[in-house]
A protein has these predicted regions:
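Conserved PLP-binding catalytic core of the aspartate aminotransferase-like
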Residues: 117, 121, 132-180, 185-186
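A short glycine-threonine-serine/GTX helix/turn-capping micro-motif
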Residues: 77-91
Length: 224
């Protein structure tokens, strides 16, 4: 961010995965634009997100339409936030996002992070003890959030995810996780990516124990 600021280049970050997990200080990190979605760690519903734009940054709108503000004007409004907004707002989504953010602020980001990381450490240790399970994480989980990716040797990631869902009623995410270049480096393209567990503030130790047992059962079926 600092290098971009010194070179006069706007610096934008995609906080879709990190908003609600990691605090963003736009001044200290020299951030000009932050894009985020509401339905992940901000605990809002789907269909809602936002764009935070630092004062002085000009973004050209790509769509135009009514805003309900100064409707007699025949051109799209040029000032923020109307420049980037048009049509009827998703008021239900906004209310849901507000409720999620309010809950997070009440609980505290640090408190949530500590709780989730304690769970993911237990999950990591449990999965690491299972023969045939390959983990994609640092040993000490430094600079980590409560997301853990893994594979079972000899098994397709999608098949593992299906068994977790159908046989164990456990939700997970399988695939390339919008990061195909990472999976090219990991060599996991042919097995369709990896299996990913995302731990949230409403997960419990019982959930973690169930997930470990389920993966152990699935791994026992692997091809040798």
């Amino acid at each position: 961010g600092r290098y971009c600021r010194e070179a006069g280049i706007p610096f934008a970050i995609d906080a879709s995965q990190s908003a609600g997990k990691i605090p963003v200080d736009m001044e200290k990190q020299f951030v000009d634009v932050v894009a985020f979605t509401g339905h992940k760690s901000l605990l809002g519903p789907t269909g809602i997100g936002g764009l935070y734009v630092r004062e002085g940054i000009e973004i050209r709108h790509t769509r135009a339409g009514g805003t309900g503000v100064r409707s007699a004007i025949r051109t799209h409004l040029g000032e923020y936030p109307f420049r980037l907004e048009y049509g009827t707002h998703n008021t239900v989504g906004i209310a849901g996002l507000h409720a999620g953010v309010r809950w997070i602020l009440g609980r505290g980001l640090d408190s949530i992070h500590e709780y989730e990381m304690n769970l993911v450490r237990t999950l990591r240790d449990g999965l690491a003890s299972i023969p045939g399970v390959v983990l994609y994480c640092q040993d000490d989980l430094a600079d980590h959030i409560a997301v853990l990716a893994f594979n079972v040797e000899g098994m397709d990631a999608a098949d593992v995810g299906t068994m977790l869902d159908v046989d164990h009623d456990i939700a997970c995410r399988t695939g390339l996780h919008c990061a195909p270049l990472v999976h090219e480096q990991l060599g996991t393209i042919k097995i369709r990516g990896s299996v990913r567990f995302g731990i949230g503030p409403f997960n419990t130790e019982e959930h973690i124990a169930k997930a470990i047992d389920a993966v152990a059962e699935i791994a026992s079926l692997r091809r040798h």
